[in-house]
Amino acid sequence: MRLPSPLLFRTRPKPRIVIPRAQAASTTVPIVFYGGADPVSIGLVPSFSRPGGNLTGVANFNAELAAKRLELLHELVPTATIVAGLVNPTSPVLAEAETRDLQAAARTLGLTLHVLHACTEQEIDTAFTTLDQLRAGGLVIGADPYFNSRSEQLAVLTLRYAIPAIYQFREFVLSGGLGSIGATVADTYRPLGVFAGRILKGEKPADLPVQQATKVELLLNLKTAKALGITVPLPLSGRADELIE
């Protein structure tokens, strides 16, 4: 089973942090993971309070906000009947969960949804060419860690192709993206270092409860909205945690 975004903390032969691609990477080496999916539902740990084994970490549930992102997109662009989701096929657990939630939300909202795949810069470029051909009126970008590193590229492409897009982290909005809903980066990543430090001091991952990101923020870029010809409803702007002008 591939993990959405884990960190493996290895104490021998010397401390180092690497990115494992599967839970089977080790059953003894302490692993600190970070992921957007529910670690219990995907079988990563038996419970939040008692993770057991050699695993602990942080769950931000950003993958489970995919439907909320589509709802936000629909609220901003109610005339768009064709929309798309962009997921990373190399993270199948995350991609499948987001695809399932987006499809359910699209049915509820009466939208036609196309799910596109990308895991390289070139594939992202190709995806936007496809979006243009599909005449998609909006895009929800998946909560995969790879897309975090491509926030600027994604924001530039959404403006170039004039496609309203919603993502998980504020960095996308600060780079020119239209909006974001998700856990804050600080709330998500800071505990990872804390866990690593505690494990280095001798504590066992099995005894460290999995933490859940507690703060979800909504950001909107009003400058981008204006460039895309979108009028942000006052109730929506009032709900936003931050407006970029």
Short names for language-model regions:
Residues 1-245:
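Short hydrophobic alpha-helices and adjacent helix-cap/hinge residues
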